[in-house]
Amino acid sequence: MAHCKTEQDDWLLAHLKYLLFIFNFFFWVGGAAVMAVGIWTLVEKSGYLSILASSTFAASAYILIFVGGLVMTTGFLGFGAIIREQKSCLSTYFCLLLVIFLVELVAGVLAHVYYQRLSDELKWHLNSTLTEHYGQPRAAEITASVDRLQQDFKCCGSNSSADWQHSAYILSQEALGRQVPDSCCKTVVARCGQRAHPSNIYKVEGGCMAKLEQFVADHLLLMGAVGIGVACLQICGMVLTCCLHRRLQQQFY
C-alpha cells in the first residue's frame, strides 16, 4: 500500500513539474513578446516622441522593456527551480511572479487613469507644435517628426489642413508661398504645398489629431492585451508553483 502511495506521489510530482515547465516556457515567451513590443515602440515610433511631448508614452515603452526583461530573468530562474526541485528557489520564483503581477496591475490602473490626461496633452501640444514650432530654427527634430506623422498617417494639420494658415512657418518667407507643408501632399515633390487642393492635399476628417489619438489608443490596447495574457499565465504559474512546493514539502516529511 505504501509502495502504491509512493508511486502515486512520484506521478503527481512528475506531472506538476511538466505542467510548470510548460507554463514557464510560455511565460518566458510572453516576456520576450512584452520586451519586443517595448523595443518596437521606441525604434519604429521614436519619430513621434518629440510631438507627443509628454513623457508618458516613452515611459510606457521603457516599462515594457523592463518588465519583459524581468519576466525573462524570472523564467530562467523558474527553469532552474523546477529541474533542481529546490523549495527555496520555488519560493523565490513565486515571489517574483507575484511582484511582476502587482507591477502589471498598477501599470494597468495608471494607464487607464492617465489616458485621458495624455489625450488632452496631445490635443494642446500638437496644435501648438504645428503653429509655433514647425519649420523654425533649432526645431529640425520637431519639423521632421511632423513631416513623418503627416506622411505616415496621410493627414494634414492638427484638426484639418486649415490649421496651417495661422502657423509661423506658412506666414514666414521660408514657406515660399506654400499654403501647407510639402509633407501634406499625397505625392511629395518640391513646393507641392503651394496648391492646397483635395486632389493634391490630404483632407482627412479630424486631421492628424484623430489619427494620433487612434495610434496611442491602439498602442495602449496592444500593451493591455499582452499584459493581460502574461497576467493570466502568471496566475496559473503561481498556483502550479504552490502545488509543486507543497508536494515537495510533503515528500520531504
Swiss-Prot record:
Top-level division of the source organism's lineage: Eukaryota
SUPFAM superfamilies assigned: Tetraspanin
InterPro entries tied to this protein: Tetraspanin/Peripherin, Tetraspanin_animals, Tetraspanin_EC2_sf
Transmembrane segments: 19-39, 63-83, 93-113, 220-240
Bilayer topology annotation: Multi-pass membrane protein
Subcellular location: Membrane
Alphabetical UniProt keywords: Glycoprotein, Membrane, Transmembrane, Transmembrane helix
Kinase listed as a keyword: no
Sugar-modified residues: 127
GO CC terms, sorted: membrane
Protein family according to the UniProt entry: Belongs to the tetraspanin (TM4SF) family.
Full protein name: Tetraspanin-11
Organism of derivation: Mus musculus
